[in-house]
Amino acid sequence: MGKEIITNDKDINDLFLKVVDLVTQARERVATAINIAEVFTKFHIGQYIVEYEQKGETRAEYGKAVLKELSKRLTDRLGDGWSYSTLKNIRQFYIVFSKGLTSGCPKSSQKANQWLADYPKAEEHISEPTFALSWSHYLILMRVENPDARSFYEIECTQQQWSKRQLSRQVGSCLYERLALSRNKDEVMRLAKEGQSIEKPSDIIKNPITLEFLGLKPDAVYSESKLENAIINKMQQFLLELGKGFLFEARQKRFTFDEQHFFVDLVFYNRLLQCYVLIDLKIDKLTHQDLGQMQMYVNYYDRYVKQDFEKPTIGILLCKEKNDALVELTLPKDANIYASAYQLYLPNKALLQAKVKEWIEEFEENEELKRLEEHE
């Protein structure tokens, strides 16, 4: 009879965890490779379709007939997944992303380039884009008409690892336009190339903050407590709306100063800036008293809560009607307090897009004037 082998529980558990980790990583690599292969394949299928159509008639009826016939043949040979609407999307995908090749996300470019090494190209002279997202993400992105906005969403989606649902929401709520409206005009063009970088405290605040996902009805009167409860209940979405790096710490945080009790509505910590972020919710117009109270909260946290290595505390006042003049007159120019108007419904997309277009045209005109002055 063979000798029984007794294994150490800790050793076998270590082995088990190593195997699980290895298999998990392998599956992730396979999933990434499949995504890259699918997107690149559809990009080149779109290229084949467009090139075929260019050799024939240019009428819309001709293109529709081509896609319907191709759909029938591909379905017969390859099975489901090649409907007329799918081929129409593939064709549009190539048309959109072959213009300027807006993709350029750093995280997956190396993997994509490795995969591309042996990939058959329809035309050798065609430069290759770098696709870092799934096909589902690109179905959303290619419907964004503004190339700068599309590039911005693609970069942000890759860096922040947004799900399809999160990307759809950010596009639908005009994140690009809202960020553009909240920043200096000269920074509008930078958004499309770099995404939203965090260099100073004001960069973590998106203005105005859209709260329509809270499900609050129009023209209703809300107490601060009800609004706060709604925000707490959907904290994950709210953090996404606020910006990058927010970690929730507490609500109605109490502290005592000069034998008086004070309560901070919401306390966050921003891991990217390494600082506390205090939020106060106001339903009525912003007053001098509100600003003074927030300044006191900020001073308390800076003196008694934050560590030496951490940056100064940020205070944010959320109010229905922002009065920038009041903020400027009441606070020092470099104060870390900002008033962000929040709105219960999606912004008027047409108006926001018109504003951004106006700013872009103004920016281009100014750049042209600068070039002319340099040559004079």
Predicted regions and their residues:
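Basic, low-complexity intrinsically disordered segments
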Residues: 1-376
